[in-house]
Every structure is written in structure tokens, then in C-alpha cells.
């Protein structure tokens, strides 16, 4: 470590060495040499921003340039040639390498903005490439391959955090650290901690801020560098002000396009966040006001102070110089960079890109009001040096008012967005009942057209979220029905309830003749239609419709897709009021019915079956007439697509077209039903029906409701037809 310090001392020179630099020996005027250095630094800043490299890379290239011209002369190596090579080298050192072609094109654009870019295949371009590579090698050899640079910005950040300086003071100090690299040769004379102390001291004088002495009785600069004294700070501050006064305004224009782009991007990312946008606007105003008047205030200080006077009051005469100095808008100054969080351990690599608007300090309020009030008071009353406590007490009310305003703005924005989000969630969560009106044919005159009785025979279907209501009673012309949408947790309970209701309903209508079977079948359909395969899967009894369903299963005319349509959707189907003859008279209408969600089993009335699982079936009571066997073909087609509520095609009203389309998208796909995870929960025992004898499950026919075993079958069941495709 000690050897490294001794080696680094070779790049710090005395005043005599600076006055005897190679350029001076070749006859270059001292002011001219300083101007050449400033112009080269300005070119590096411009090129770095166009190449989109970090401020750290630009500052490193500037230090390379300063050190290079302590060994070489401007007469042998012009600054416009060395600057691109220095930036090309610094970009690689700071791990932001740029293509050689890009560096040459950017340098050409900065030096010759009116000319077109050179052709990459031309002799002039190839010569520039060769010259830049040679200059890079010369810079490396001149610097002795010592490429690691320590910048004062790191120490500025640490010190401002140590003394808990305001944002305004930290921002100005950071800005002066960058100016020290661009405009002075402090990087060749003093170590980075000393330069950082000078920048902070200069910012304190300009802001009329005095950093108090610590509890140990030490000044703040003693914690940064023990070799720094107050006399040295005053001397270097005066020298800095003199250099600023002599520097042309065009060299003070330190552009920072990256900061502007980052600020625009930050505003674009704050989508509708009014509080953040207004806060960014306030910070931009602070940055612009401070950066616009920094150099002017410092130059006015230099006219009214001497190096022996530590306190520099800004008089009315000096403040009038603000109008005589040509200043650039604040967006071109480094201090207008967006706010970021700085960590001391990140060092200069992070802090170079910032303007210290986000430095942690004890004042949560912005220092803009303090700065503006000082600027206004300086025109009327000469400001004196005040302590930190007095300064805070003086501006406590203004800072508190500003903080309250920002808090109110933030609260308003949050409340607005919370209200909007709550309304959006409540809109999605609210499930009002949807009434579906679908005209159907009455049972009295099935041949009458739909349009004549659409107003009288409308089927109203109410779809609430929380089901459980009992179905409304059937009317001859209008049927009101609640379709229950089951949640995942309520499926099994609803299955048990519906099966129990179907058992009671079956006992109630047990004595009705078979020619009226379909009317009562669909009347009980309101209780158990969504659990048709469930009753068979759970081996529980159902109404007479279950016997016809299981007969279809035994003959494999009950397709799997129809069970999916009845179980996966978990919705109740619409009832029907047709007689048994209506189905047999219109098999063609049944085959092409695809407009509703109910399955119509139109077999003749069959006796009930035994209710105990595992008993053998009694098929002697099964008397399949010839018409019923003929209707199996349309029913096998019917299973491929759902039918209407009464077995015929149904029309839809335009009022609830969207809801009907949603139901159709779930229930009708011409036999191709969407598979859902819960679909297989209700048809789990379906494989048992593939072999009725082995599975012990019969076609469920019997003539009693008691749990006694039925008689043995007199003949085996008919052969099984092939499964539908």
C-alpha cells in the first residue's frame, strides 16, 4: 500500500513543475495551455455523452488527458486527436467498451458537425483508425499503464453524508468536483480528498452555510484529510474562482444529455403518479435554479472577496452580475441529474452518474426554499454566516409547509387510486343474477312456430353465484328456473342433496303411468339434471330417468361427451314440458338440437332398480319396444351435441346474446367438449360400466324401492354396440 502511494505521487506536480510543462517549453502560453486542456475536456464530455458512456468514464478520460500532457506537448499531439484515443481507452478500463468505428464517427460529428460521416472503406477513414490505435498505445506507454484513477467525487459523497448536508449543498459540491476536472489542474496538484474539501468549502461559502464543529472540537475537513487546513482551502477556493472568471462561457457549458434522458424516462415510467411527477418537477426546478446561478454566484463572490477573508457575503452589487453573465439552461449542467440512492461503498463508479439529489441526510425536506430565500435576501440585506441550527430554525416553517403539501398530494393520489382499484375489484366480484329468456314450444302444440309464442313461452333462467335455492314450480306456459353455479368446495354436498331430492320425487311420482313419464321426468329434472352421471357414479337411486340413462350405458349409447356436458359445466339444465310422443315424432329435430344444455333421454318408462351396490341386475323387466330401439340412433347422435330444453331447437333473444354465447362456448362443440380438471370427478366409476358383469353394476332395473336383492336375470343383456367416435 505504501509503495502504491509513492508510485501515485509521480502524478502530482508542484506549481514550478506545472509552469515548466512540455507545452510551456515549446512556447505555449500558460493561459493557452489551460484553454487547450479545457477544450479537450469539453470534447471528451461531448463525445462521452454521444457514446452513452458513464460520467465516470468521461472523468477518467479527462484525467488521462491531463496526465498525458504533463509528459507530452500540445504541439506534438493536438487535443482533438488525443481526446478520442483517451476516451476509447477509458471506456475499456471502466468496462464500457465502445467500437472503434463508433468512436471515430462520434469524434468526426463533434469536430465537423456540418460534414457527412466518412466512408468506412475510404482511405481517410482507415487512416483515422490507424492513428487512433497508435495514439492509444502512446497514451498507455506515457501513463506507464497506470490506469486506475481515484476521483474527488467519491470523497464529496462521503463527506456530505458525514456532515448531513442538505441536498442543495451536496449537489453544488458534486457539481464543483466535476468542474474541477474540466476547468482546473487540481487533479495534477492535489489528492482527491483535498480537491473534495475545496469543492465542499466553496459550496458552503456560496450557500452561506457553515458546517458546525464536531463534538470533539474538530472541523469537518479534518475527518476527510488531516493535511487540509483552512488557509489551504481559502487559497484554493480563490484560485478556483479566478479560473472560473477567466474561463469562456462556451467551456462552462457542461452538457449532460444522459441526465435529461434519464429524467424523461423517469417521468414516463411514473404512469399517472401525480405525486412523483410533481416531486420530480420540484427537483428539476431546484436543480435548474441552482445550476443556473452557481457559476454566476461564484464569480460574483470572487469580485468581492480576498483569499484572507473566509466569509463571503453576497452584496447587492455582486448579485447584479447575474444578468451580465451568459448562462446556459439548467439541463446542460451536471447538477440537473435525476435523484438516485448513493451508497458510500459504491465509490465513484456509482456517484459519477449522479448529481447527489438523493444523498441521505438528516433534512427530509428539500433545500430549495433555503436556497431561493437566500438568493432573494441577498439582493436587499447582506447575508452573514449563520450556524446550522439558526439556518434550520429560520426556514423550519417553509420547509414544514412544503413537506405538508407533498404529503397531502401523496395522500390524495393514493386515495384516488385506492378508490379506483376498489371499484374495479368490486365490479369483477359482483355477480348479479342474469336472466336468460329463450322462447320454447309448449307441450300442447309442438308444431306451432316459435315466433308466434315467443312472448308467452319465454324460459327465464336466473344465474346467481351462491346457489342452493329450490327450483321454482313449473307453469304450463312459462318456466322460471335458477341455475346453480357450484363452487369447487360445494360440489359433493350439492350432489348428495340433489340425489336425496330425486329419491323423494321418485317416490312421489312412482304410481304415474308410463305415458306421462316424460312430463314428470323433466319436472324432477330440475332437482337432479346436473347430477345425472353422479347418481350412477355414486350408485345411488334416481328417478325413472336414471334407469333409461343406465340402460344407455349398458348398451354404450350414452357417450362420454354428454356426461362431460352434464358434469363439467356444473350448471342445471332447463326443464321441458313435452310428452313422450313428441320426441318420437320428431327424431330429426332431436338429432340436430344444439342450442341448450339439457340432455333428453326419450326412452319409454322403465321400472326402478335395486339400490344396493354389487347386486346382480334383473333385466327381465326390460321391455324395449321397437320404436324405442329405433330412437337409439338419434340419441347416439344427440349425445354428441346437447339438445334444447324440450328436445327441439331453441332460439335466443338478442338481449342476453353475450351470456348465451358464453354458455354455448362451454356446452356445444359438436361432440368435442373442453376437458376440465373437475370433469373426471363425477364420472370416475364410468369404467365399471364397460363390463357390467365384472363390475357388479347392472343396468339398474327393478320394480321395488326397498333394498332387497332383485331376482336373477333370466337372460344375458343384449350385445354391446361399438362406442361412438
UniProtKB/Swiss-Prot annotation:
SMART domains: CYCLIN. The record marks 260 as: Essential for interacting with SIV Tat. A motif (Nuclear localization signal, and interaction with Tat-TAR RNA) lies at residues 252-269. Residues 365-381, 614-629 have a biased composition (Polar residues). Residues 506-529 have a biased composition (Basic residues). There is a cross-link at residues 341, 414, 480 (Glycyl lysine isopeptide (Lys-Gly) (interchain with G-Cter in SUMO2)). The modification Phosphoserine is found at residues 116, 339, 387, 494, 498, 563, 576. One of its GO terms (cellular component) is P-TEFb complex. The histidine-rich domain (HRD) region is intrinsically disordered and promotes the formation of phase-separated liquid droplets that enhance binding of the P-TEFb complex to the CTD (C-terminal domain) of the large subunit of RNA polymerase II (RNA Pol II). This is Cyclin-T1.
